[in-house]
Amino acid sequence: MGNKKIVLAYSGGLDTSVAVKWLTDKGFDVIAACMDVGEGKDLNFIHDKALQVGAVESVVLNCKAEFAEIFVGAALKGNLMYENKYPLVSALSRPLIAKKLVEVAKEKGATAIAHGCTGKGNDQVRFEVAIHSLAPELEVIAPVREWHWAREEEIEYANQNGVPIPADLDNPYSIDMNLWGRAIEAGVLENPWNTCPEDAFFMINSVEDAPNEPEFIEVEFKEGLPIALNGKIMELHEIIKEVNIIAGKHGVGRIDHIENRLVGIKSREFYECPAAITLLKAHKDLEDLTFVRELAHFKPVLENELANLIYNGLWFNPATKALIAYLDETQKVVNGIVRIKLYKGLATPIGRKSTNSLYSEKLATYTAADEFDQAAAVGFIKLWGLPTQVNAQVNLK
């Protein structure tokens, strides 16, 4: 009888490369699976390295389009920002990666899935809750959480077992990147008083180094999602990639966040999210133009709840599904074009138009073209203030 098969979420880094050997020693045939969500890595190198370190099979999946349309799409429709600051960069990719791991496991006849998360972060929760939501029968193993090695012990194990040490191992920062942004933590950033060194940034110029002239872009939306950039129809993942470059050049999207983690601790995180910040601002601006007042005031309440659900690893929870369905309904009128000024760290919507616009210049103007019936205000004010007036008459004696 052969070894049991296990699918490992493989990144090509030291932790998951050592995990291949560690799991093999535990009696598993390791199938390495790498999901491309736009991190910009050399996927051929990762594919080959997995086999080099002992995986019996290496699978690389291009998930950029699905990640953008389904997961980032929900974040855009919902203007999602955890604690009003973090655009859910890593939190959005984890359910997709978990879904693909389950699909590979079922296709290959694996009985278990492994990931490279520590026992201290949010991602262990996100992966395991998602996997068990989709395939409760699969065992989940977290080698890094189990072996409790210091970095030096891990390197020693790698050297003893012929696992290549990555060239960038001395990088003082822990990095996670996808299409929607880049997360930076550890090193000197663990002291919240310290300023983030410039060498930590990859996507975004400093404000000082940003161009001295503004740049203007136009983003067209259809039912809440971008479909064109500067008049050119593009796939969503292509628009995000392009806006990352343009907005990053102008210093847009650096975030310094003291974050309340799901596991109960505070962490200090830096994020680079040029496209996320730019497109979220444009999207919200278009909603302001096309939403009735009641929807504009109520939707943010549910946005906050949905951001918390996704951050906390509950993408496949029925509550998340219901809230995303609500978002989809609201977005039917979010069609139009937003013009954005990019300059010295700011993404500022400066123009917008829509066939679903509820803005009436004839009602808003103070010129002779005004069609607003000001005489109607007298009766409106009387009825609107009646409960307050009655309260005063009864209680202010």
From Swiss-Prot:
Chief localization: cytoplasm
Any GO CC annotation of this UniProt entry: cytoplasm
UniProt cross-references to Pfam families, sorted A to Z: Arginosuc_syn_C, Arginosuc_synth
Coiled coil: none
PANTHER family in the cross-refs: ARGININOSUCCINATE SYNTHASE
Self-association state and partner proteins as the record states: Homotetramer.
Name the UniProt record assigns to this protein: Argininosuccinate synthase
Lineage of the species this protein comes from: Bacteria, Bacillati, Bacillota, Bacilli, Lactobacillales
Gene from which the chain derives: argG
